Regions:
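Glycine-rich, basic loop-to-helix element that forms the pyrophosphate-binding segment
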Residues: 62-79
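A short, conserved alpha-helix in the catalytic core of glycosyltransferases
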Residues: 165-169, 174-193, 197-225
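Short aromatic/hydrophobic "clamp" motif used to bind/position activated sugar donors
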Residues: 84
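Non-catalytic, C-terminal membrane-associated alpha-helical segments of glycosyltransferases
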Residues: 238-248, 252-306
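Short, flexible, basic/aromatic active-site loop/helix in glycosyltransferases
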Residues: 132-173
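Short, well-formed alpha-helical segments that are part of the catalytic scaffolds
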Residues: 16-30
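Conserved donor NDP-sugar-binding/catalytic core segment of glycosyltransferases
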Residues: 95-128
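A conserved acidic beta->alpha catalytic loop
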Residues: 26, 33, 42-52, 64, ...
Length: 306
């Protein structure tokens, strides 16, 4: 009888190898499951520093850089385990992470699930979220509301599932952030994997929306936690453009791009009015410059520029 591995850990890689090598060490030190039952796949997305060959690790070397979704798909293509653990390269795992996540997903059946994710600042990263709408994006785009980020009111406005994120019981949610996801490999392939039109951001939202349409539930498992660095190595403005463009691709795919573009432009002009008033008291506030930057982000997103 051919033995089917229980777990394939798929790690998209771009950057420095050290954090991924630390994850590999953590996976090999897992308790509650035979480490030999954990297959490790690293998907090197043409990193400037190539990932080294490591004994017992499958390294997929992609021919061209394609972003998170393509790297995940390439990694899952090489995987053989029943459950795929999609792990960001900047995670820190404790030594019972795999066994506890397996127990949770096997309890719920054919699902996609994420643990609770904590940043190095000790704060949760709002893993569970509602499927995005134009109003959610505009709420985040409206800069005068930024001062309210510490409030649950603001988090609800941008689509965070406050009840799930602050609860202690397993919660069925719309979608979970993609830093640490567990899903059956057969389900991943049946749904068609990640949509490779997304370069960075929103591919996990789209994937889970398709899971929802197929009747596959998504769960947050708050009893299991991982630590996540977050942010990546790219400049902040570039990350903002990646996110904006990805949101436009998602909105176009699901039929509300025009609504999103119009609402963000209106919000940008409201931001301009608020910043103009602020500029009367603070000469460092460049209302016209902020407006130009926001309108250019929207235009680039419509042109699908990253």
């Amino acid at each position: 009888m051919i033995h089917t591995l229980r777990v394939s850990a798929v790690i998209p890689f771009y950057g420095e190898p050290e954090p991924v090598l630390a994850i590999i060490d953590s996976l090999r030190a897992q308790q509650g499951i035979d480490p030999a039952d954990i297959e490790i796949v690293v998907s090197d997305d043409v990193s400037p520093t190539p990932f080294p060959d490591v004994e017992g690790v499958t390294v997929v070397r992609r021919p061209v850089n394609g972003g998170f979704g393509k790297a995940v798909n390439s990694g899952v293509d090489a995987a053989t385990g029943k459950w795929v653990f999609i792990l960001n390269s900047d995670l820190e795992l404790d030594n019972t992470f795999v066994s506890r996540m397996l127990a949770a997903v096997e309890r719920h059946g054919e699902v996609l699930a994420s643990p609770q994710i904590i940043g190095h600042d000790g704060k949760q990263q709002w893993v569970a979220r509602k499927f995005p709408t134009a109003a959610h994006v505009a709420w985040e785009w409206f800069t005068p509301l930024a001062r309210f980020k510490p409030t649950n009111w603001w988090h609800r406005g941008v689509g965070h599932d406050v009840e799930a994120c602050t609860g202690t019981a397993d919660a069925k949610v719309d979608w979970v952030m993609g830093a640490c996801m567990v899903v059956p490999r057969a389900t991943f392939n049946r749904i068609g994997g990640m949509d490779e039109r997304f370069y960075m951001n929103s591919e996990e939202v789209d994937f889970q929306y398709r899971l929802s349409n197929a009747g596959v539930d998504r769960y947050l498992i708050p009893s299991v936690t991982v630590t996540h660095e977050g942010g990546g190595s790219s400049p902040s403005e570039r990350r903002v453009q990646w996110l904006t463009t990805a949101r436009f691709i998602y909105a176009d795919k699901w039929g509300w791009e025009k609504k999103l573009a119009n609402l963000l432009r209106v919000t940008s002009y409201v931001n301009f009015l608020v910043n103009s008033v602020r500029g009367l008291r603070n000469k460092d506030v460049d209302a016209r410059g902020f407006l130009a930057t926001e309108l250019e982000r929207i235009a680039k997103a419509e042109r699908r520029e990253n």
